[in-house]
A protein has these predicted regions:
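Alpha-helical scaffolding within the catalytic cores
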Residues: 1-4, 53-60, 89-91, 139-142, ...
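N-terminal binding-site loop/beta-alpha segment at the start of enzyme catalytic domains
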Residues: 1-69, 186, 280-282
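Acidic-and-aromatic substrate-binding clefts and catalytic sites of carbohydrate-active enzymes
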Residues: 22-26, 44-54, 78-83, 109-114, ...
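Short, acidic/polar
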Residues: 23-36, 81-96, 115, 140-142, ...
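A structural motif
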Residues: 40, 98-101, 129, 153
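A short, structured active-site edge motif that brings together acidic residues
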Residues: 66-79, 102-109, 136
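CE4/NodB-like, metal-dependent polysaccharide N-deacetylase domain
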Residues: 85-105, 122-126
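Beta/alpha (TIM)-barrel catalytic core signal, keyed to glycine-rich beta->alpha loops juxtaposed to Asp/Glu
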Residues: 108-282
């Protein structure tokens, strides 16, 4: 598996396995174990997904040394604020059954964000978290929060695919040496994306499927991707992208597909109200 280097010199696998919306108590365990067997070594979960325990069990039962697996999790809004965040980090570690987490993110940009960030910084300095990062942060939100941060985020996980290329955000993140990480890299099954003429023609040329062309393009853009699937053949296919390379002209053709229309706007007050109301524990 190819890797990228983060701004703290830690390496991260270029393609990770996402477990968003896969249920706990069995399905996430099975999917994670299958992904590890397929060759993934980067698993992306979150407190808000309510499946950290299944991820932890699968990693333990895989027989693969913990040092070879990169675990990402995220703090949910309910546990923002300095003291709550410290407890939330410990809860994630307990559910995952680990004594450190490779990458821990603030999942959404609301509430007592900087209080939670301070707790992440302290956990990072203590070695409980190897890298810390942000998620769903726009340029405006970055400008709002950045001056309250002592440790620079290693990653910003956002919606990213050929239709949502985040060009302004990528420029600002690059200026701060923050690596972009893609959720919905395949557009959450968007037929318009997967059946796009440019992508389909490249798939035919390289004897790949549309998803593999997209994931290869994301890799060549220097962005980490987190495809999700419970289908074992598709899992394998999503990391079978390192035996070909898109040309400069093909990269430009993919870049021309940008619509700049994300599925939701993190700056929308209605989005903030909805997410702040979601509770994951008593």
């Amino acid at each position: 598996m190819k890797t990228f280097e983060l701004n703290n010199k830690q390496t991260i696998q270029a393609v990770g396995f996402g477990v968003f919306m896969i249920p706990n108590d069995g399905p996430t365990y099975d999917a994670t174990l299958a992904a590890l067997k397929a060759g993934y070594r980067h698993i992306d979960t979150a407190a808000g997904y309510c499946n950290e325990s299944d991820v932890g069990k699968a990693i333990k039962d895989s027989g693969i040394d913990r040092s070879e697996i990169f675990i990402t999790s995220k703090l949910w809004l309910q546990d923002y604020g300095y003291e709550n965040a410290k407890k939330g980090i410990e809860t994630s570690m307990k559910l995952l059954g680990v004594d450190y987490i490779d990458l821990y993110l603030l999942h959404q940009p609301y509430g007592d964000y900087l209080g939670a960030w301070k707790a992440l910084e302290e956990a990072y300095q203590a070695g409980k978290i190897k890298s810390i990062g942000i998620s769903n942060i726009t340029v405006n939100l970055w400008n709002k929060f950045k001056d309250g941060m002592t440790v620079m985020p290693a990653v910003n996980q956002v919606e990213f695919n050929p239709f949502v290329q985040q060009k302004e955000l990528r420029k600002v993140m690059a200026e701060n040496n923050i690596r972009l990480e893609a959720w919905y890299p395949l557009g959450h099954g968007n037929k318009d994306l997967l059946e796009n003429e440019t992508i389909v023609s490249l798939a035919k040329k390289y004897h790949k499927n549309a998803g593999q062309i997209i994931l290869r393009w994301i890799y060549q853009e220097g962005v980490i991707s987190l495809p999700k699937s419970t289908n074992e053949e598709r899992m394998k296919g999503n990391i079978d992208i390192f035996d070909f390379e898109l040309t400069d002209e093909e990269m430009k053709a993919m870049q021309a597909l940008d619509t700049n229309k994300p599925s939701h706007n993190p700056e929308d007050p209605a989005n903030e109200t909805r997410l702040m109301g979601l509770k994951i524990h008593d």
